[in-house]
Amino acid sequence: MSATVENVEYKDTAIPVVYEHSSYIPIVSMQLVFTDSGHLANTKDGLATLSAKLLGEGTSKDGATKFAKKLDNNAIELNAHTGRETFVIEVSALKEKFDTAMDLLQELLQDPNYTQDALEQIKRQQLGYLAQKQSDYDYIASLNLREILFDNSALARPYDGTPQSIESISLDDIKKFISKHLGYDNLIVVAGGDISDKELQDYTKKIASLLPKVEVKKLASIKVSDKKVTRYITKDTQQAYIYFGAPFDYSYEAKDQYKAKITEFVLGGSGFGSRLMEEIRVKRGLSYGAYCMLRESKEASYLSGYLQTKIATQEEAKAIVQKVVDDFVAKGITAKELQSAKDFLVGSEPLRVESLAQRLHRAFNEFYYNRGLGYSKKQLQDIENATLDEVNEFIKSHKELRDISFAIVTAK
């Protein structure tokens, strides 16, 4: 069966449940997705990340080791992680063990390991991660690009924290974050596998009964800078790491998403055959790869891309990126490029829906972005029927893509 979305009524809230039944393998997986509770909800840099990590430390009664042993003994996976917009708790188990999995999830939600030992453990882990990132020049270039594109906004912040912000986070900060952001009224359940609709409704109500009501906020739109800034960050490196981005004045709710899909594919999303790859690698040999994509989210839409090149050719590569985008916006694409995009995007569709996890992820995105289930299939039809004139009209209307900013990690 294909995925469905149903509402489970609980108190004053209709909890959306994205669901696909599959008895091919006797496994059940469930995601609890809490909206407006990811990195953008941080009151201190890294707070959402540490809050998720703390839920990986078991309960205060059992501690991390004993709780992990309970999970292992029953072959249950239970973890938490954060994205920009959401906080997610995932649980999966064999069907025969899923009741046990739900019981352990209940223990975790009712008794998180709010102890100083657990806090110090997750702080050590995060500080170690941040120390490693000091020599990850892709990370540094990406962070600097976000600072440029989203100046003075939550998107410009270091999501994973800084050593100073991580040290400043207290148990009380984490308690407040979890209690204010993990509620029944900002919950979306995504589930699939060998589980009936009735069982899923019962589990959803059980989980909801463990959660408070929280204040649900709408994500604010963030303006993307069009100032065409170039920032150089000097490090001990033999390569230049070039990250670039520009505004893309386009809503995630727009009805003609297929045009953006084709645009992205031809400009820099397709690897070999894309404009960027052809000009930077194939014709000039300046880099092993050059890519870009059009990112669309509830808070911002923008172009972002990256490449690596020799220090001596960084300015040439930067200039080519600008010229490729300028020419692309001015002239659009060719009939051959359009056909190549159609062939790949339509022809590779089976690979994007072959697993239950892929199908559930797609169904969740269709629901979350208000596109309706089945939107992706309709988009494929729109791609097949797209004309060269309408795609080029779309490309030429987005002159803001030329307002490119660069963050370049280069040698001292």
Predicted stretch roles:
Residues 16-21, 176-179, 228-234, 394-395:
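Short, surface-exposed beta-strand/loop micro-motifs that present aromatic residues
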Residues 22-25, 31-36, 216-273:
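His/Glu-based metal-binding/catalytic segments typifying zinc-dependent metallopeptidases
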Residues 69-215, 283-284, 289-412:
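Charge-rich, well-structured scaffold segments of protease-associated domains
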Residues 31-92, 271-286:
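M16/MPP (pitrilysin/insulinase) zinc-metallopeptidase core fold and M16-derived inactive scaffolds
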Residues 2-27:
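N- or domain-start disorder-to-order transition segments that initiate the globular core
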Residues 10-11, 23-26, 181-183, 235-237, ...:
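Extracellular/periplasmic catalytic domains that process cell-envelope and extracellular macromolecules
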Residues 41-44, 99-101, 253-256, 314-317:
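Solvent-exposed, non-transmembrane alpha-helical starts
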